[in-house]
Amino acid sequence: MFKSGFVSIVGRPNVGKSTLMNNVVGEKIAIMSDKPQTTRNTIQAVYTDEEMQIVFLDTPGIHKPKNKLGEFMVKAATEAFKNVDLILFVVDDSKKIGPGDRKIIEDLRSVKTPIILVVNKIDQLDQKDELFDIIKMYDREGIFKEIVPISALKGKNTDTLIKVIQNYLEEGPKYFPDYMITDQPERVLIAELIREKVLHYLNDEIPHGVAVEIEKMKARNDKEIVDVSAVIYCERDSHKGIIIGKNGRKLKGIGKSARQDIELLLGSQINLQLWVKVKENWRNLQNYINNFGYNDK
């Protein structure tokens, strides 16, 4: 009997939701960063084997929004509670339930969909007793069907998580062909890969005010080289200088690192050109939010 279903991955920012999804499908389809609110859209990823197909919805981290972009991100995350077969609530190795996790738990109490708690980052725990205490702490909430400890970064116990998910799926069709692992267009994936490198190179300087738009993407006649032109948008002139760096070094580093990942994604040589432009307060301008792909589908 072949099983299939839709599984939503929810949690507060920076608990490893995207890392988990990338590990399960075996490809980088969601960008990873230690900066909160890295994921901005609900990303659909597909895991398929001989017995099942799981369609994962990786959501933005649930947080208190400060602008229109933040409002969209929270809406996308909470909408992912609906019309799915299973919810994975991902938490990290924190010893206490903080206000962010508490808010999500209270939101989940009214949800009828089965919920599995995924305790991530167990590789950072020194003692087994620490993990036991975390599991016991969350189990007292009384809303989780099962609790599965994993390390998404190390790939530890993710195979067990897949088997647990399988138990909650019903007989169903393949929604996507075997080769398909995401519904994200190539342009979106490329823009997100570039944004990942920007976040990496900027450290904590200006991560949330950055967006990337692909202006041109065209294969040359021999199709061995793909020309990609992209604009990195920021909100202040001072931010533009930080992104470019002294003598353009930081922008060159971003471009070199992004090009390597894009070449792996497309399987072609990439000629990548990057520009930096300023658009003040774009996170509160709906037309820019839409243009950057952060809109309801």
Swiss-Prot record:
Monomer. Pfam families: KH_2, MMR_HSR1. It is a peripheral membrane protein. The gene is era. It comes from Clostridioides difficile (strain 630). Gene3D superfamilies: 3.30.300.20, P-loop containing nucleotide triphosphate hydrolases (3.40.50.300). GO terms for biological process: ribosomal small subunit assembly. HAMAP family: GTPase_Era. NCBIfam families: era, PRK00089.1, small_GTP. This is GTPase Era. An essential GTPase that binds both GDP and GTP, with rapid nucleotide exchange. Plays a role in 16S rRNA processing and 30S ribosomal subunit biogenesis and possibly also in cell cycle regulation and energy metabolism. Residues 194-280 form the KH type-2 domain. GO terms for cellular component: cytosol; plasma membrane. The keyword Glycosyltransferase does not apply.
